[in-house]
């Protein structure tokens, strides 16, 4: 049996994805009832951060500790993948001392190359092209609040970035319609649209995408590494803010999500996080539970391989 990794949502079957989402909610209930569950005592998670993140570090580190394991944090100062030592060599050495690895970096090819030479499961904590762990949390959150997302309509408002790419994959796997509203020149990459165009519809304005939506999602206008484009992007995205007026075009029970951190007054209105249908705080917490379910799945699959 081949070693299992989680670099994109498509590394799972739809059945496996649904199983992980169900398990995430089970683990959440166990924690809320103060039930101690430590199946991975002695297991060590390596966390390689070339892009910093509060939520990613806390959720993974807390998750493996709650499982009875431990985590090692490696910052850009500790390891620079591909700079000084080939990624392939780093993967061989690092994975020989750990049980599972999470990488948050820039180029998606970095996690692919690392995984190719790793002896243990590798999780993509975020790359420029994909953010699959966030999709686990988003899907879990929607299901907890509204039930199955199959057949529903999701509106993505803003940049055709890594989050948007992962939503495109999720639409294909989970059977929902995805309406993407982006300024010209900021649409998702053609290769993602070419493969999953059957479940995606593009719009050049936010209002048309929001009509009858069951879920509206957005992200920052300028992601990490795009700070020099901030002013240019503010101008391009000025008409793509998610606010109360836009939510009024959607279904009355439409949920709102944002992976955070959010910039009030830019991609969202000043009060959007307090909207009655905003579930961003549940969404943020569910990173912990969804990633615990993912780690449990990957570690157990690796034990089967052994």
Curated annotation (Swiss-Prot):
It is found in: Cytoplasm. Pathway: Amino-acid degradation; L-arginine degradation via ADI pathway; carbamoyl phosphate from L-arginine: step 2/2. Its EC number is 2.1.3.3. One of its GO terms (molecular function) is ornithine carbamoyltransferase activity. Carbamoyl phosphate binds at residues 53-56, 80, 104, 131-134, 259-260, 287. GO terms for biological process: arginine biosynthetic process via ornithine; arginine catabolic process to ornithine; citrulline biosynthetic process. L-ornithine binds at residues 162, 219, 223-224. Pfam families: OTCace, OTCace_N. This is Ornithine carbamoyltransferase. It comes from Acinetobacter baumannii (strain AYE).
């Amino acid at each position: 049996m081949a070693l299992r990794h989680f670099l994109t949502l498509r590394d799972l079957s739809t059945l496996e994805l649904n199983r992980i989402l169900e398990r995430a909610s089970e683990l959440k209930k166990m924690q809320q009832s103060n039930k101690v569950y430590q199946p991975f005592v002695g297991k060590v998670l390596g966390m390689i951060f070339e892009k910093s993140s509060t939520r990613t570090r806390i959720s993974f580190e807390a998750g493996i500790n709650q499982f009875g394991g431990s985590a090692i944090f490696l910052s850009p100062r500790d390891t620079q993948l591909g700079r000084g030592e080939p990624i392939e060599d780093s993967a061989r050495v690092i994975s020989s001392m750990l049980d599972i690895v999470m990488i948050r970096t820039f180029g998606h090819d970095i996690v692919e190359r690392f995984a190719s030479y790793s002896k243990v499961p590798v999780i993509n904590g975020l790359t420029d092209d994909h953010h699959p762990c966030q999709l686990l949390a988003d899907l879990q959150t929607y299901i907890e609040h509204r039930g199955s997302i199959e057949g529903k309509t999701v509106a993505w408002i803003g940049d055709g970035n890594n989050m948007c790419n992962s939503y495109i994959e999720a639409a294909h796997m989970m059977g929902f319609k995805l309406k993407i509203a982006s300024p010209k020149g900021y649409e998702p990459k053609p290769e993602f649209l070419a493969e999953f165009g059957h479940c995606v519809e593009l719009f050049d304005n936010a209002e048309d995408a929001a009509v009858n939506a069951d879920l509206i999602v957005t992200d920052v206008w300028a992601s990490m590494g795009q700070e020099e484009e901030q002013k240019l992007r503010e101008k391009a995205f000025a008409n793509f803010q998610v606010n109360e007026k836009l939510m009024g075009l959607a279904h009355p029970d439409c949920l709102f999500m944002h992976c955070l951190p959010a910039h009030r007054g830019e991609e969202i209105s000043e009060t959007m996080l307090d909207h009655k249908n905003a579930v961003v705080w549940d969404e943020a917490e569910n990173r912990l539970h969804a990633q615990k379910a993912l780690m449990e799945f990957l570690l157990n699959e690796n034990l089967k391989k052994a």
